[in-house]
């Protein structure tokens, strides 16, 4: 079985938008809440969401907090926040990973305003120091490209964050 169902509310691709999925759903908080509620009623595992902090010209704390509260009230208790807004027109998905500016502070404020939620932060995280800092304000960190580019980074995280010193060094593996 699966540990959870995760709804992706962050993908900005045209193909995904065309079918009203991904980041375009941030424009429809009531619909997202209804979907999450129905998913919660249909399964026994947690329903989580990954979303952006905004879209196009919408990057205000009040909007994001309203969106988070709607999905929280629908039964979602874990939210992964990509600390960039999604530009839905004019940028490719790859450009959406770099061009919109990171706003970690907004993620921290969402956690502060919703302490009962498990909030994970995502976006541009590439060092142990960044992870350590984010964990002061959030419940967890999601890392993508840094691990794709350097899979051994997982062992550095294991050693430095989880204090598991039984991890073999790169030299020992070779």
Question: Where are the language model's segments positioned?
Answer:
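Flavin-dependent oxidoreductase catalytic cores
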Residues: 1-174
